[in-house]
Amino acid sequence: NLYQFKNMIHCTVPSRPWWHFADYGCYCGR
């Protein structure tokens, strides 16, 4: 779904602070 897709983008292109990754539960490697 779109949510998972956004997570993939956030993981591939870290354009947000690290705390945003933790918020998404998608910290490149999880």
UniProtKB/Swiss-Prot annotation:
Catalyses which reaction(s): a 1,2-diacyl-sn-glycero-3-phosphocholine + H2O = a 1-acyl-sn-glycero-3-phosphocholine + a fatty acid + H(+)
Names of the cofactor(s): Ca(2+)
SUPFAM superfamilies associated with the record: Phospholipase A2, PLA2 (SSF48619)
Main location: secreted
One of the record's GO cellular component terms: extracellular region
A single GO BP: lipid catabolic process
GO molecular-function terms, A-Z: calcium ion binding; phospholipase A2 activity; toxin activity
Residue stretches spanning the membrane: none
Enzyme Commission number(s): 3.1.1.4
Family designation: Belongs to the phospholipase A2 family. Group I subfamily.
Protein name (Swiss-Prot/TrEMBL): Basic phospholipase A2 CM-I
Species name: Naja nigricollis
Source species taxonomy: Eukaryota, Metazoa, Chordata, Craniata, Vertebrata
